Amino acid sequence: DDGFAVWDTLAIAEYLAERFPEHRLWPTDPKARARARSVCAEMHSGFSSLRSHCGMNIEASLPEIGRIVWRDQAGVHADLARIETIWTELLAEHGGPMLFGAFSIADAYFAPVCSRIRTYALPVSPAVQAYVDRVHALPGVQAWVQQALAEHDFVDFDEPYRAR
């Protein structure tokens, strides 16, 4: 768009939803749309323990670290409990397969959480694991994963197991 830049994820989501309304990126029902925006805002600003202790890493498989984090970090338990509550309520209310029935911005917002659950093999309920698997299988998420795997930059401090 002629060099127009938007850098905040919620602003990006709103811009895309307005620019491409035919994709119905937000739920059409006003109450569902408000709830979707609310869970996106919560995701945007919350879950700091999960973010701190389970860094985003699409390439790695770190179940051993996940077990240690799960054992030692009560904040991660609290974050995952809240995430499970959000997801199970929305999946039940809207009938799945995504949080608001069809794919929405809310599912995109939670894709990094799904990735962390996979990377660290964090314990979640079967229903939540099924949702994680559905999100991971989305073509857009698969494209994101492939792009991430093609990157070769890393920070030694964040990824000491990769240091050569």
Give the ranges of each region predicted by the language model.
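GST-like domain detector, emphasizing the conserved glutathione-binding G-site
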Residues: 1-69, 162
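Short, thiol/selenol-centered motifs that function as redox-active sites or metal-ligating centers
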Residues: 6, 36, 107-108, 138
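Short secondary-structure boundary/hinge segments and terminal tails
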Residues: 16-17, 135, 152-154
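Active-site-flanking alpha-helical
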Residues: 17, 113-114, 145
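GST-like fold's C-terminal all-alpha helical module
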Residues: 43, 47-137
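Acidic/histidine-enriched, glycine/proline-rich intrinsically disordered or flexible terminal extensions
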Residues: 148-164
